[in-house]
């Protein structure tokens, strides 16, 4: 192993995560807080751990994350994407299994903009026939 640290950038909705992975004991630090403190919801924590559990490296890597923008779901998705990219930098042979699980592809869904004359992006004003 030439590099001691592996990097991956992850994005989801309006969130961007910078992920640094190195060989260690399995600590995940998000914005200088432990994962369990940063995310209150168990689903968010589960989403972050998914790629590590898939390749069975939960206890083998220390992960340091800086994440900005968006809300909980977007940030968790961005971290997952970043961890996936860092894992692929660590070992390219993990790519097929990560792709099969759907972690490699960037989720391009974003909030649709509100249009003029409508109440929301697609919600039309109530129609009264008479």
Curated annotation (Swiss-Prot):
Gene Ontology CC: cytosolic small ribosomal subunit
UniProt keyword RNA-binding present: no
Ribosomal protein as UniProt keyword: yes
GO terms assigned for molecular function: RNA binding; structural constituent of ribosome
Pfam families per record: Ribosomal_S9
Record's keyword terms, sorted: Ribonucleoprotein, Ribosomal protein
GO biological process, one term: translation
Protein family: Belongs to the universal ribosomal protein uS9 family.
Protein name (Swiss-Prot/TrEMBL): Small ribosomal subunit protein uS9
Gene (name only): rpsI
